[in-house]
């Protein structure tokens, strides 16, 4: 990994930590509220309220699709009144399903607008929006801009939600269901960098990174498939 790379994510205990490396993750993430008996369901719905998927994760949360085009994402839309499940959303499920929605969204594919463009920043922002909708945080976790802009913000400490960690810690956090982000800053300001989220939940079985970018590298891919070791 070059000096221009980094790993970032939501730090829910931001006041206790400070960015100390190019890597970050959700420190002390309390969002993995999974019912050990696995008998209660999170619902994921389309924009019209039609059921897309049940996930047996112990929560009674309802996430609904909102936005259009590159901005299509899930947001918490309350809790199922007919369920005795936890009133805490399971963020592992939310991140997992948003990553899958990104990959299914034709607007996020390379050249969707006819300019050979890629949409890694919007895909990552969609995951951030999903998480942001489901947590009670004073400062929004969504980071705007292109990939280079997002990487600069994440590494600067300007957004107090993010904590810098090693790659191995970012990976472990994602394995535990937390939000971890990898970014690459292109040293040529006229060219794009790259940013992506670590796979969580069942997505990990498909690949370490949930990557949106050039078509040949879009999908659940190894880290080196998302951010090549030989980048300048």
Task: Show where each model-derived region lies.
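Short turn/helix-capping motifs enriched in Asx and small/polar residues
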Residues: 1-84
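Loop/turn elements at helix/coil->beta-strand transitions in domains of secreted/extracellular proteins
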Residues: 4, 133, 176-179
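Structural recognition of the beta-strand scaffold that forms the well-ordered cores
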Residues: 7-9, 24-26, 53-54, 126, ...
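N-terminal capping segments
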Residues: 76-144
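...with weaker cross-activation on analogous glycine-rich loops/strands in unrelated enzymes
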Residues: 138-219
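Glycine-rich, aromatic-bearing surface loops/beta-hairpins
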Residues: 212-232
